[in-house]
Structure formats: structure tokens, C-alpha cells
């Protein structure tokens, strides 16, 4: 933070998960944000009568997801109850392979978020609002995929990508602001694709 005009923050997160393949076990997820209080600049002095605050902000961040059951890297076996009807190599057995096929190459599902926003306050704090645009992308989705014809029912895989983007706007009018009570009117609108 420099002179309450330029603000920057950054973060690095490292997550490890035994649910994922050894060569993909660690995920590194950086994030950063910056803001510029435009209203503090000398060239904005002519707006002081009506503009209280104007701030532009931008952010970028990543996050990981490993929300799958434990034991998807190697083939699991499950106990068979009742009279064993499963034969392996000519011998009946009380244990059967899990219906989910193992996948030794699973890695982190990663979500990337990008935001650009503008916040403002005008007329001695009577009116405030913000406008924000965003793009969110999720890569390497962890999906339980059907694998018919293999003897198994499904397998967890990293596949696919999703993206959503949108625009949001908020406006608040502080109609009454007394010592012990107040009245505010707020509205927002959003578009998402």
C-alpha cells in the first residue's frame, strides 16, 4: 500500500494430496490483486465536490480441487458377501475388484479467476456502487467417466474445461443516515454466460 493510492497483494499456496499421482501430488496456486485509487490523484482535484472515492481494481487467482474418493490410483478390491460366485484364475473368491477402474495419472483440477472492477462513492457518501467483470476457467476437470466394455463401470479422469464470464453491477443509495438508524436502498444486476 503506497499512500492509500496504489495497493498490491500477492499470495502463493502449495497443496499436497495423496489422492493424486505422485508426479502430480503437489499443486501450486498463485494469486495477486492490485488497486488504484484514482480519486487520490492530483488530476482528480476538480471532482472533490461530488466524487468521494473512485477505485479501479484487478485480480487473478488460482485454486485446486481434489474432490475424489481415496484410492483411485491403484486398483481396489472389495469384499463379496454371501455365497461367492466370483471366480479368479479358476478359484472362487470372497474378494472382487472394485467396479471403478484405477487411474495412476490423476492430477489437480484447477480453477483460474480473473476480475476487473470499478468502485465509486459520490455526493458525500449518499450514493455508492461497483461494476465488475469476471472470467472463470476450470481446467482438468475431475470427472467420473463411464468405461463400458472393460468390466468396470467408471474411471475418474482429468478431462474437459469449463468457462463462465459475466458482468455485475451494484448501486446503493444511503437515503437516511442518523446516529441510531438509517435507510438504504440497494439494487444489483448480473449477466453470466
Describe the predicted segments one by one:
Residues 1-193:
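Extracellular/periplasmic, surface-exposed regions of secreted and cell-surface proteins
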